[in-house]
């Protein structure tokens, strides 16, 4: 009996020791599991941060290299352009208003000291003697419009005729005003006759009629000669 009790006690002690051992093993597993996971998570986070920082550094480095390359390329382009620069050759001044007939009025000198009235932008008055000389020049220019009639260049004929007639009318008015009273009337009649034929010639150019242009050009030439004879 005593022997049986001793064997039962031995079995109980052995089973208790086995149970305690299993508890210790399982307890160590529970403790080691979370400890291992807590250590692993920070390591993974550190790895991710390191990778992000390295990627940003790589992007910045590439951007800087691209900027430097663009700067070098633009600098070389500017140097090439400057190397190929050629001096600009400045020639003589162009003809009056491009040399087109009927546009010389824009090249006439104006008195910039005058106030902003019509006198500043219209033909400036000349003394009677100088006005007579300019009237002769305008009359000779009117005689040269025959070339436009021959070429049937009607716009050029009108432009040149009107320009010269404006000078001639202005200067003849100055000359007539300085003449004695007995000479004014005859010169005014000749002037009126002259500008009547000029107006008819302008109308012939407007309707593009070679026949009428020839007719009124002949009358204009005759009237100009009479006026110039009076001017002396």
Curated annotation (Swiss-Prot):
The gene is PSBQ. InterPro entries: PsbQ-like_dom_sf, PSII_PsbQ, PSII_PsbQ_pln. This is Oxygen-evolving enhancer protein 3, chloroplastic. Pfam families: PsbQ. Belongs to the PsbQ family. It is found in: Plastid, Chloroplast thylakoid membrane. Residues 1-83 form a transit peptide. GO terms for biological process: photosynthetic electron transport chain. Its main location: plastid. Residues 92-111 are annotated as: Disordered. It comes from Spinacia oleracea (Spinach). GO terms for cellular component: chloroplast; chloroplast thylakoid membrane; extrinsic component of membrane; photosystem II oxygen evolving complex. Keywords: Chloroplast, Membrane, Photosynthesis, Photosystem II, Plastid, Thylakoid, Transit peptide. One of its GO terms (molecular function) is calcium ion binding.
């Amino acid at each position: 009996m005593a022997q049986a009790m001793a064997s039962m006690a031995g079995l109980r002690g052995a089973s208790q020791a086995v149970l305690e051992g299993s508890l210790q093993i399982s307890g160590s597993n529970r403790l080691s599991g979370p400890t291992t996971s807590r250590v692993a998570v920070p390591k993974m986070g550190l790895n991710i941060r390191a990778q992000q920082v390295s990627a940003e550094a790589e992007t910045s480095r590439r951007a800087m290299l691209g900027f430097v390359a663009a700067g070098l390329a633009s600098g070389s382009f500017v140097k090439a352009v400057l190397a190929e620069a050629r001096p600009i050759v400045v020639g003589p001044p162009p003809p009056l208003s491009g040399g087109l007939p009927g546009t010389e009025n824009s090249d006439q000198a104006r008195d910039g000291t005058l106030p902003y009235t019509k006198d500043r932008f219209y033909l400036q008055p000349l003394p009677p003697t100088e006005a007579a000389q300019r009237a002769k020049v305008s009359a000779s220019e009117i005689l040269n419009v025959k070339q436009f009639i021959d070429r049937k260049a009607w716009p050029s004929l009108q432009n040149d005729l009107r320009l010269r007639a404006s000078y001639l009318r202005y200067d003849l008015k100055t000359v007539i005003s300085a003449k004695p009273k007995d000479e004014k009337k005859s010169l005014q009649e000749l002037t009126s006759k002259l500008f009547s034929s000029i107006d008819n010639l302008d109308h012939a150019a407007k309707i593009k009629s070679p026949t009428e242009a020839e007719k009124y050009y002949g009358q204009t030439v005759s009237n100009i000669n009479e006026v110039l004879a009076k001017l002396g």
